C-alpha cells in the first residue's frame, strides 16, 4: 500500500477558488471530452496524500482541467509539476497557478495519448528497474473517454520500459470510473474479473485506494469514481511480449460467459482449431471448462508460455486473426452467390 504523505511546507498564496476560476474564464465541462471537475480541495488533498510522499518528486499530471488536483500537488513540496492539457480553455487558469508558484509548474498544451515524456525530466533522476522507484509520479483525474486506452498504453510502456517508465518504476495514482477501478483490482473468480485485471496485475501491484461519490464532481457523472494506485513490478508475472499476452487475454475474455476453450480456440485457424486448442490446454495444464473469470495469473502465464512456443513452431500463427478469416469466408460466399445468379441458378 502507498504510504500516506504529508502536504509540504510550500503553500500557494491566496487565489480565487476553483469555482471562481471556472466562472472567471467561462469554463464548462465538455461532454464530448467526458470532463468532470473535482472542486472540493479536501478530496484533491486526499488524492495527493494517498499518492504517498511527493517531497522533491517530479510529478506528471494528466488532464489538470481547472487545476483542482494541481493546487494540492503544488502544496506537497514537490520538485516540479508538469501538466499536459489538451483543452486550451484551461491554460489561462493554469497559468495563474504557475505565476503563483514560480519555477514549480510547467504547462504543456498537448494530448496525453501522444505526448513524449521521455525527456521532460532530468536524466539524473533515472533509476535502474531493479532499484527503488524514481522520484517521478503520475497523477491524474482521467477523463472517462481516455482512461482505459491510456492505462493500456502505459501498461505496454511498462513492459517495454519506455515512455514515463524510462525513468524506472514510475508510480501512478489515477482516477477511473468505479467499474473500471474494480476491474483493475478484481481477483480470480470475481464477476469484475476482466482483460484489464490481467493486463494490469501481471505488470503492477494495483490497489483501489478509495471511492469518490459522483456528486462530488461538476457536472455530476452517472457513476462514482475510484482512485487507484499502480506500482510496476520488478519482474512481470508473465514473461512474454505485451502484444502476445494481450492477444491471449483478449481472446479468452471476448467469450467471458463461455468455457475458456471457446475463446482460446479463436487463436487458431479453423482448419486446426480443435486440435491446436486441445494441445494448448493440455500443455498448459488448464481445465477447458473453467470460465475466463476463474483463470488465475498463473493460468494465463502457462497459456502464454505454451502459445509462444506454438508461435515459434509456426511463425504465421501469431499474425492469425479469426475475424479476418470470417470476413474472407463471407466475401467468398458472396462471390459464389454472385456467380450463381449470373448463371441463372
Curated annotation (Swiss-Prot):
Protein purpose: S-adenosyl-L-methionine-dependent methyltransferase which specifically dimethylates mitochondrial 12S rRNA at the conserved stem loop. Also required for basal transcription of mitochondrial DNA, probably via its interaction with POLRMT and TFAM. Stimulates transcription independently of the methyltransferase activity.
Recorded GO CC terms: mitochondrial matrix; mitochondrial nucleoid
Subcellular location: Mitochondrion
GO molecular function, one term: RNA binding
Upper lineage: Eukaryota, Metazoa, Chordata, Craniata, Vertebrata
CDD domains: AdoMet_MTases (cd02440)
InterPro entries given in the database record: KsgA/Erm, rRNA_Ade_diMease-like_C, rRNA_Ade_Mease_Trfase_CS, rRNA_Ade_methylase_Trfase_N, rRNA_adenine_dimethylase, SAM-dependent_MTases_sf
Gene from which this protein is expressed: Tfb1m
Domain of life: Eukaryota
Transit peptide: 1-27
Subunit structure and binding partners: Interacts with mitochondrial RNA polymerase POLRMT. Interacts with TFAM.
Sorted UniProt keywords: DNA-binding, Methyltransferase, Mitochondrion, RNA-binding, rRNA processing, S-adenosyl-L-methionine, Transcription, Transcription regulation, Transferase, Transit peptide
This enzyme's EC code(s): 2.1.1.-
GO biological process: rRNA methylation; transcription initiation at mitochondrial promoter
Ranges in coiled-coil conformation: none
Designated name of the protein: Dimethyladenosine transferase 1, mitochondrial
Organism whose genome encodes this protein: Rattus norvegicus (Rat)
Keyword Transmembrane helix: no
Family the entry assigns: Belongs to the class I-like SAM-binding methyltransferase superfamily. rRNA adenine N(6)-methyltransferase family. KsgA subfamily.
Chain sites annotated for binding S-adenosyl-L-methionine: 35-38, 63, 85, 111, 141
Enzyme class: transferase
Amino acid at each position: 500500500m502507498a504510504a500516506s504523505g504529508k502536504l509540504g511546507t510550500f503553500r500557494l498564496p491566496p487565489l480565487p477558488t476553483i469555482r471562481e476560476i471556472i466562472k472567471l474564464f467561462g469554463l464548462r465541462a465538455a461532454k464530448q471530452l467526458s470532463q468532470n471537475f473535482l472542486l472540493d480541495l479536501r478530496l484533491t488533498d486526499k488524492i495527493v496524500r494517498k499518492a504517498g510522499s511527493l517531497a522533491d518528486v517530479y510529478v506528471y499530471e494528466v488532464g489538470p482541467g481547472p487545476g483542482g488536483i494541481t493546487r494540492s500537488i503544488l502544496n506537497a513540496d514537490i520538485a516540479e509539476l508538469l501538466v499536459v492539457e489538451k483543452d486550451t480553455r484551461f491554460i489561462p487558469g493554469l497559468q495563474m497557478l504557475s505565476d503563483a508558484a514560480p519555477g514549480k509548474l510547467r504547462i504543456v498544451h498537448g494530448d496525453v495519448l501522444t505526448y513524449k515524456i521521455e525527456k521532460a525530466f532530468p536524466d539524473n533522476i533515472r533509476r535502474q528497474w531493479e532499484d527503488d522507484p524514481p522520484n517521478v509520479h503520475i497523477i491524474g483525474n482521467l477523463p472517462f473517454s481516455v482512461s482505459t486506452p491510456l492505462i493500456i498504453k502505459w501498461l505496454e510502456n511498462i513492459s517495454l520500459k519506455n515512455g514515463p517508465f524510462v525513468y524506472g518504476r514510475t508510480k501512478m495514482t489515477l482516477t477511473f470510473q468505479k467499474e473500471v477501478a474494480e476491474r483493475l483490482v478484481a481477483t480470480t473468480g470475481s464477476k469484475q474479473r476482466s482483460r484489464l485485471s490481467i493486463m494490469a496485475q501481471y505488470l503492477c501491484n494495483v490497489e483501489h485506494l478509495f471511492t469518490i461519490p459522483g456528486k462530488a464532481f461538476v457536472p455530476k457523472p452517472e457513476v462514482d469514481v475510484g482512485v487507484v494506485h499502480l506500482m510496476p513490478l520488478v519482474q512481470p508475472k508473465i514473461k512474454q511480449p505485451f502484444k502476445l499476452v494481450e492477444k491471449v487475454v483478449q481472446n479468452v475474455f471476448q467469450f467471458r460467459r463461455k468455457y475458456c476453450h471457446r475463446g482460446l480456440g479463436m487463436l487458431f485457424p479453423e482448419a486446426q482449431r480443435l486440435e491446436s486448442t486441445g494441445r494448448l490446454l493440455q500443455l498448459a495444464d488448464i481445465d477447458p471448462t473453467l470460465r475466463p473469470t476463474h483463470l488465475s495469473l498463473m493460468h494465463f502465464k502457462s497459456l502464454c508460455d505454451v502459445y509462444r512456443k506454438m508461435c515459434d513452431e509456426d511463425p504465421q500463427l501469431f499474425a492469425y486473426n479469426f475475424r479476418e478469416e470470417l470476413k474472407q469466408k463471407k466475401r467468398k460466399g458472396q462471390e459464389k452467390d454472385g456467380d450463381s445468379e449470373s448463371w441463372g441458378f
